[in-house]
């Protein structure tokens, strides 16, 4: 078969094991991990879905090696418990039966153990251990590990690696990056020891070397050992890329695959988990430089979801393997689609952090663009309907398109009506923001799915009660979306005012001095985008905080980007009048201020089109509202 991306689709052999292509599934934690560290059935299904989707390897995350000194959150595995080993075996089986290589990530959190515990066990009260005596930024004291404790942990890595092999895992990943224990020993910022484990680079690498030696002794030769580390810690006081190269050279004889990530979780979540504000493949330069200096295969990771970019990475020799995490939540079948030359059908990750925020908030996984995530046990196959019906969809936004596609796959006769000349609803506006192009492109993907499934799409067609009566559907799905909130502020009808939903149609009207009214998610992201273009942007928000509607993972990175791109933020300001000079506002003390700008963006929120819903609610035998 001739592949569209021949280098990405080419096999690679690592430690005697041949992988069918270069697309691997990175560690992503499960959600139903039990108190004794077992992988629950939902998590096993979560990993299995990536194997069904065609990933060459699927890594199960994160297995503790030494519970006495570790346990950073409620989703750690513990294979030393008999039931946990059985559950790990089931997970490995679930992965391997689809042709993927099951891998297990071994991790120790070190001084950050206990940070995210939710009273899963007594570990929330345990002492924090690290390379050196110190105090964490949150005030928690950390004690230096003794040599005896280090020996225990080293041996524990070997023991758990042996158990993983027994359970059916065919590859081991040692997590040596992102600020966890091995990284803490490697880092001059964390490691202040004066014995053989601290000081020189050779000494700081000693713990990692001993861990890798113990793992190799346990699993034997011709068993792939992967070392995941940060090519650079990306903060002052940590090691840089130059030292990252030397670390890689020190460790390469003990490993079979070097997995190059970046940053430390505690010092920069947006480095370890790149946000939409960063370039796709932002870590590739680290892997590319390190690859020049080692003789083993190198993997890269970091916001990768475009097969054309991944093909270039492999073809140019920047890396040998590409890892994806969130991209395989958005579309678990991405690797299979690439191998089948169907890359146009890939649903791309938005990097919105819904997946990670939901786990923090509710202990579940969810994905903005993939409703199957968190429901993997229900199966990904759409079952044919017992009774075929005539279905009418009112609204051609993402919700309406997805509903139409699903109904058509079930065998129904589906007509989708869109009152405008183009599909997409509110997503049409996202084309104005370069870092949200994936969201705009989602419309094209869903439209293709719907048309290929046989959906009839009618443009310039508004669904009214009379229209429903004429069409006489068996079922009506109302996906009317929302409309922008435009309050009657004096001057709102001025030529210099642009509603944020219409920004994409008015980019040529935007001057160099802009006032954005509204500090919600849409207003903040608009302000950031205009700031990136070099415009002088001021942000006005009536509340005392920006973007309270943003999720807990996205919001801190959003605010950091606001600091970089926006000239001034005015919270507690109520906009009262728009003039050619800017926006007159009143602060909490009743004082008036002019926020200067020659273009004003109105981003004051959206309101659901409940009027449409009420008109159509009882017009068909079966009605559902999205």
Give the residues covered by each predicted segment:
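Short phosphate-binding/catalytic loops that engage adenosine nucleotides
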Residues: 55, 100, 169, 295, ...
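Short acidic loop-to-helix transition motifs that present clustered carboxylates
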Residues: 305-308, 329, 462-465, 503-506, ...
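Flavin-dependent oxidoreductase catalytic cores
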Residues: 1-394, 398, 402-409, 510
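A short helix-to-beta-strand connector/capping loop
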Residues: 318, 450-457, 493-496, 562-568, ...
């Amino acid at each position: 078969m001739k592949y569209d991306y021949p280098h990405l689709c080419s096999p690679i052999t690592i430690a005697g094991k041949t992988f069918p292509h270069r697309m691997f599934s990175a560690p992503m934690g499960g959600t139903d991990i039990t108190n004794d560290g077992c992988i629950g059935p939902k998590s096993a299904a979560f990993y299995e879905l990536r194997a069904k989707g065609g990933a060459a390897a699927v890594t199960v995350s994160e297995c503790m090696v030494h519970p006495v000194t570790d346990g950073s959150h409620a989703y750690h595995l513990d294979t030393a418990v008999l039931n946990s080993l059985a559950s790990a075996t089931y997970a490995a089986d679930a992965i391997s039966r689809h042709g993927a290589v099951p891998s297990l990530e071994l991790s120790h959190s070190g001084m950050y153990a206990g940070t995210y515990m939710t009273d899963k066990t007594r570990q929330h009260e345990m002492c924090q251990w690290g390379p050196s005596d110190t105090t964490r930024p949150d005030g928690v004291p950390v004690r230096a590990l003794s040599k005896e404790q280090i020996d225990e942990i080293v041996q524990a890595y070997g023991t758990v690696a042996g158990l993983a092999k027994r359970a059916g895992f065919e590859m081991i990943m040692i997590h040596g990056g992102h600020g966890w224990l091995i990284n803490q020993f490697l880092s001059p910022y964390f490691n202040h020891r004066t014995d053989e484990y601290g000081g020189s680079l050779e000494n700081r690498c000693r713990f990692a070397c001993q861990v890798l030696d113990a793992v190799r002794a346990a699993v034997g030769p011709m068993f792939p050992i992967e070392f995941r580390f940060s090519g650079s810690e990306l903060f002052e006081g940590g090691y840089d890329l130059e030292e990252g190269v030397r670390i890689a050279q020190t460790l390469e004889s003990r490993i079979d695959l070097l997995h190059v990530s970046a940053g430390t979780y505690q010092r920069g979540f947006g480095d370890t988990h790149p946000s939409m504000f960063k370039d796709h493949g932002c870590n590739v330069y680290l892997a590319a430089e390190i690859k020049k200096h080692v003789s083993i295969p190198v993997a890269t990771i970091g916001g990768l979801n475009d097969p054309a970019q991944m093909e270039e990475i492999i073809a140019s020799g920047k890396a040998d393997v590409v890892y994806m995490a969130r991209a395989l939540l958005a579309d678990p079948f991405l690797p299979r689609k690439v191998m089948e030359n169907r890359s146009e059908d890939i649903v791309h990750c938005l990097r919105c952090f819904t997946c990670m925020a939901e786990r923090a908030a509710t202990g579940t996984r969810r994905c903005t663009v993939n409703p199957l995530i968190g429901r993997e046990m229900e199966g990904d196959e759409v079952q044919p309907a017992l009774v075929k019906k005539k279905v009418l969809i009112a609204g051609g936004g993402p919700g309406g398109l997805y509903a139409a596609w699903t109904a058509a796959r079930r065998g129904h006769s589906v007509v989708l009506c869109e009152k405008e000349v183009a599909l997409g609803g509110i997503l049409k506006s996202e084309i104005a923001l370069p870092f949200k192009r994936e969201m705009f492109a989602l419309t094209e993907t869903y439209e293709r799915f719907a048309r290929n499934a046989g959906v009839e799409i009618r443009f310039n067609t508004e669904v009214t009660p009379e229209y429903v009566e004429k069409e006489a559907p068996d079922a009506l799905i109302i996906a009317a979306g929302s409309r922008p909130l435009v309050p009657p502020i004096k001057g709102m009808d001025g030529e210099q005012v642009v509603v944020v939903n219409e920004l994409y149609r008015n980019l040529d009207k935007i001057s160099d001095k802009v006032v954005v009214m509204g500090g919600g998610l849409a207003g903040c992201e608009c302000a950031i985008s205009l700031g990136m273009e070099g415009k002088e942007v001021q942000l006005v928000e009536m509340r005392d905080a920006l973007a309270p509607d943003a999720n807990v993972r996205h919001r801190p990175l959003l605010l950091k980007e606001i600091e970089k791109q926006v000239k001034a933020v005015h919270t507690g300001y109520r906009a009262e009048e728009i003039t050619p000079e800017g926006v007159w506002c009143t602060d909490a003390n009743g004082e008036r201020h002019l926020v200067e700008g020659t273009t004003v963006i109105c981003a004051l929120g959206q309101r659901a089109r409940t009027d449409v819903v009420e008109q159509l609610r009882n017009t068909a035998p079966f009605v559902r509202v999205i």
